[in-house]
Amino acid sequence: MENIETILRLAEDKILLVQNLKALQEYKVEFLGKNGIVTGELKKLGSLNEQERKEFGLKINKLKDKIQNIIKAKAEILEEQELNFKLAADKIDLTIPARRYKQGSIHPITQCSEELIQVFSQFGFTIENGPNIENDFHNFTALNFEDDHPARQMHDTFYLKSQENNKPLLLRTHTSTVQIRAMKNGKPPFRFIAPGRTYRSDSDMTHTPMFHQIEGLVMDKNINMGHLKYVITTFIKSFFENSNIELRFRPSFFPFTEPSAEVDIRMNKNDKWLEVLGCGMVHPNVLKNVGIDSSEYQGFAFGLGVERFAMLKYNIKDLRQFFEGDMRWLKHYNFGSFDIPNLAGGLTK
């Protein structure tokens, strides 16, 4: 009995002074392990008679339970201490300046495209899309390009090795290809724009091998140049947010429109005229190529370069800067992620 009390006091004294869970586990093994002190006392049962064995066994089990409870209580204290220490170490010092949050922004081409689409949506234009890789028919033949037209030459068009109908496929040189596909697969009336990337073999301050276009088509019965001029004039004034802007429609030539015109603008009377887009009435041959009766339906088409409009509106001097990835330039000309253009609030914030 005295030995059991001695073991209990020894366990209490040692466990009380424990400073960490690792040391506590070592004392658990020392007292309750396979070769521990309490286990050693249990081995004495074999030398006792039945009555003594019963009484001594009961005392040993109580000793074991007390030591287990002492260890459990100490473990809870140590675990709480370790948790508090960890929380204190991980505590955020709110007085330290926060790191700058890196947030993406909207590229001026993307912003300009959204603004252009927003304006045309006010006229009820929908959006049509088409493939970047095209065949000769959709890119040239259906649009009334002659076989010897300069645009078909290698120095103007990117041709691919793959062929279709014994003619090489190509990267589309305009989004007019989308108009052809839409007219072939649908029935008039039409009123849509076709935004997308286009490709031409050219590179300087005002040209890049890849650029963005938006082409539009309106087709119905009794459509005329008056409708074209109204849409273009209203669109230009809305996009540049300037009701006093001057426009002039200058006669021109495009294989797929007749009559054709190029549109020039100037913000003030003393400014030079700037060419911004081409347009015209859809050529009867184009309608014939897509199976539409030109005696019943007429339409007008127009095409503009997104980069050109972005340069004019945001005062960007060199077209190549759009694609150089200069972070300083992008930071200067970028737009906020939530700068969503709308006519009511003003297109560009």
Swiss-Prot record:
Pfam families xref list: Phe_tRNA-synt_N, tRNA-synt_2d
Top-rank lineage group of the source organism: Bacteria
CDD domains associated with the record: PheRS_alpha_core
Binding annotation for Mg(2+): 258
Cofactor: Mg(2+)
Subunit structure: Tetramer of two alpha and two beta subunits.
Uppermost EC category: ligase
PROSITE patterns given in the database record: AA_TRNA_LIGASE_II (PS50862)
Organism of this sequence: Rickettsia peacockii (strain Rustic)
Lineage: Bacteria, Pseudomonadati, Pseudomonadota, Alphaproteobacteria, Rickettsiales
Keywords: Aminoacyl-tRNA synthetase, ATP-binding, Cytoplasm, Ligase, Magnesium, Metal-binding, Nucleotide-binding, Protein biosynthesis
Cysteine pairs bridged by disulfides in the record: none
Entry keyword Aminoacyl-tRNA synthetase: yes
Gene, per the UniProt record: pheS
Record localization: Cytoplasm
GO CC terms in record: cytoplasm
Designated name of the protein: Phenylalanine--tRNA ligase alpha subunit
GO molecular-function term, one example from the UniProt record: tRNA binding
Family statement: Belongs to the class-II aminoacyl-tRNA synthetase family. Phe-tRNA synthetase alpha subunit type 1 subfamily.
Reaction(s) this enzyme catalyzes, per UniProt: tRNA(Phe) + L-phenylalanine + ATP = L-phenylalanyl-tRNA(Phe) + AMP + diphosphate + H(+)
GO biological process per UniProt: phenylalanyl-tRNA aminoacylation
